[in-house]
Amino acid sequence: MSSPRLRPGVAAVIVVVVVACFLPALGSDFVLWDDDMNFTDNPSYRGLSPSHLGWMLTTFHGGHWQPLSWMTLGLDYSVWGMNPLGYHLTNILLHAVNALLVYRLIAALVPGVGAGAAAVGALLFAIHPLRVESVAWATERRDVLSGLFFLLTVLAYVRYARARDAGRPGGIAFGASVACFALSLLAKAWGVTLPLVLLVLDVYPLRRFSRRALLEKVPYALLAAGAAVLAQLASNLVPAKRTLGQHDLVQRAAQAAYGLVFYLWKTVVPTNLSPIYLLELTLRPTALRYVACALLVAAITVAVVVVRRRAPWAAAAWSCYVLVLATVLGFLQTGPQIVADRYSYLACLPWVVLVAAVLGRPAAMAVAVAALAVLGVLTVRQTRVWHDSRSLWEHTVRIDPDNYVAYLNRGTVRQYEGDLVGAFGDYTDAVRRNPEYFHAWYSRATERLALGDNAGAAADYTTTLQIDPWYVEALNNRGLARQATNDLEGAAVDFEEALRLAPPSWPPRGMIEANLLGVRNTLARRGQ
C-alpha cells in the first residue's frame, strides 16, 4: 500500500495549527537566558560580511560550534535588526516545516498509515509543550534548524533504502542524505549518533541490515566524528563543565536513567515545565528517584529485548530514543541542568511514529484529537511563559522555590528594572541555596557596591574570589570597594592581580590600568 501524499490542504492545516499555538512568541522579547550573551551583547553575529562569516565559522561562543545557525541569525539581523519578532518568526516557521517533515517521516516508516493519522502524529510532535523551549527561545534556533536537516537526512536515507530494495540506484538520495546530515551538524552537533539510528532503521522497519548497510554508514560516521571533536572542543570552554572527580560515572549513569524516564513522563504529563532543572550539587545515586528510574529503564530494556521478534517496533523505538538522547544524558555533563525540555525535540519522534501507527481505529483517533486540544492549550500557556525575562524567572521560582539560578536571574531582571532591594533579596536567596554559586555572590557584591555598602561589597567579592580566584571583574570591583573604604594598599593589590590575569587584548584592561594609576598617585601623594 502506498504512503499518503502530503496534500496542500493537509499541509495548510498543520502549518496553521502550529503557528497558532506558538503565536504568542511573536510578541516575546529576548530573555535573560543566553539571549543576552548571543544577541543583545554580541555584535559579532550582526551581519553576513566576510568578517561576520569568518567569526561564525570559527567561534565556539557559548560552548557551541554552530556556524549554520549563526548564519541564519545573521540573516535575521540583516532583515530585522534587533527586533526579536523576526527571530521568533523564523523559529516558528522552521518548526512548522519540521512538522510537515514529521508527517512525511510517518508516511515513509508506517506502511498503510492514513493521511489523518500521519497529520495527527505530526501535530502531536509539533504542538507538544516540550517543544516550546526549542521554538519560543531565540537562542535555540540551532534546535529547529538542525532538526530540519536531521529529518531530511532520515527521509532521504529511507528513500535511498527503498530504491535499493527495488533495484534502483538511489545515489542521488544517498548523497542528499549525507549532505543534509552535514548541514544538521553545522547547525548543532547533537545528531552525532544518527549513523547508529540509521542502522536501527535498517533492522526495522527497513529490514535491510547487512554488511553493505554497515559500509553505507561510513560517510555519516566520519562527519559525526568530526562534529563530535568540534563539539567537545567547544564544550571544554564552558566553566560549568563537571569533571569526573566532581561527578563520577555512577552518578552520571544515575542521571542518564533519570533523563530517560523524565522525557517519557513529561511527554505524557507535560506540566511544571522549566527552563532549568537543576542537577544536585552532589547527586546521590542511591536516592529513591534515581534507583526507581534505573530499575524502570532496565525493565523497559529487558522487555523490548524479550519481545524483539514479536514486536520489533518496540525495540526499534526504544533504541532510537536512547541513541538520540545519548549525548545529552549527562555522560559529558556541561552546565547546571540535569535534563532540559529542548533535548526532547528529536528524541521523542519514535513515540509519535508509534502513536500514528495505531490511529487507524476511530476510538484511538478520537483520543488523539482530544489530546491535541489539551496539548495545544498547554503549549500556548507555556509559550507565554517565555514572553520576557520577568515572566520566565517568576514562573521558574514559582514551580521550583529552591532554584538558585532562577533567583540569580530574577535578581538581575529586578536590578535592570531599578528594584535594587528586590534584587539584593534574590541574590541572597541564591547564595543561601548554593553557597558555592559565585555568580550570585558577585551579583550581590555589585548590588552592594551600587547601594554604597562598600565594606559588604568587598566581603562578597572576597567570597566570590575564594570560589573563583581568576574572576578578573571581581578583583577589579573589590579594588574599587577597597578604594572607597580607603584601603588603598589592598585596592592596588587587587588592580595589579586583575591586570596580571586579564588577557592583553581585553577591552576593560584600560579601565583597570586607570584605576591602578589613580590609587598609586594617591599613595604617592600621601608618601606611602
Model segments located where?
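Polytopic membrane enzymes that build or remodel cell-surface glycoconjugates and lipids
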Residues: 1-425, 429-439, 443, 477
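Canonical positions in the second alpha-helix
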Residues: 396, 429-430, 463-464, 497-498
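Helix-start (N-cap) detector for alpha-helical repeat units in TPR-like alpha-solenoids
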Residues: 404-405, 438-439, 472-473, 506-510
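Register position in tetratricopeptide repeats
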Residues: 416, 450, 484, 515-518, ...
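TPR/TPR-like (Sel1-like) alpha-helical repeat modules
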Residues: 488-504
